[in-house]
């Protein structure tokens, strides 16, 4: 028991140190995402095809399954797919290019964030609300729920960097 606990504590401390070392770049990325992804959600609600919604529903289900298994790498993969599929369905080529650059910069952030299973659990309901708004074609709600979701991501980041609030 004590050996496992000390390994977990060491892993948590390494995660906190990584977040602190990268805090400014991560906050920059979160701010850019919070400017662009609510717009992408609005545009998807207005422009999406039925196959876009089916794909997003499938991705969300895979995300939930990965959270239930506490598989951080798969959670990160499907979180990225969830957000990227929304951006792609916006049909806005500049948003798609910027999203690609942002995804590359936050890949490590996603993987480290989802090692803390509470962060993954915290994403299920916001993703479900975004999906439901998109399925209803409600652009205002899709934009609102995406903005709220990314505000929580920012709060999780601040919690991890400022308070060292991480438990693996």
Language-model features, listed with the residues they occupy:
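Short coil/turn segments at secondary-structure junctions
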Residues: 17-24, 66, 70, 114
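C-terminal effector-binding regulatory domain of bacterial HTH transcription factors
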Residues: 139-168
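Short acidic-aromatic low-complexity motifs
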Residues: 134-137
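Conserved amphipathic alpha-helical segments that form helical-bundle/coiled-coil interaction surfaces
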Residues: 29-112, 124-129, 141-152
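Short amphipathic alpha-helical interaction/hinge segments
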Residues: 12, 107-110, 114, 154-161, ...
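Active-site loop of classical SDR/Rossmann-like NAD(P)-dependent oxidoreductases
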Residues: 119-121
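Short linear motifs at protein or domain termini
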Residues: 1-42, 159-168
């Amino acid at each position: 028991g004590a050996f496992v606990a000390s390994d977990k504590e060491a892993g948590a401390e390494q995660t906190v140190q990584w977040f602190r070392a990268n805090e400014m770049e991560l906050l920059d990325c979160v701010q850019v995402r919070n400017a662009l992804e609510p717009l992408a959600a609005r545009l998807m609600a207005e422009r999406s095809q039925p196959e876009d919604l089916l794909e997003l529903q499938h991705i969300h289900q895979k995300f939930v399954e990965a959270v239930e298994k506490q598989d951080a790498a798969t959670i990160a993969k499907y979180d990225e797919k969830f957000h990227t599929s929304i951006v792609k369905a916006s049909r806005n080529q500049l948003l798609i290019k910027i999203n690609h650059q942002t995804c590359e910069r936050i890949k490590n952030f996603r993987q480290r964030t989802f090692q803390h299973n509470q962060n993954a659990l915290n994403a299920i309901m916001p993703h479900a609300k975004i999906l439901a708004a998109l399925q209803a074609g409600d652009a205002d709600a899709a934009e609102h729920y995406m903005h709220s979701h990314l505000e929580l991501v920012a709060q999780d980041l601040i919690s991890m960097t400022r308070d060292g609030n991480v438990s693996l």
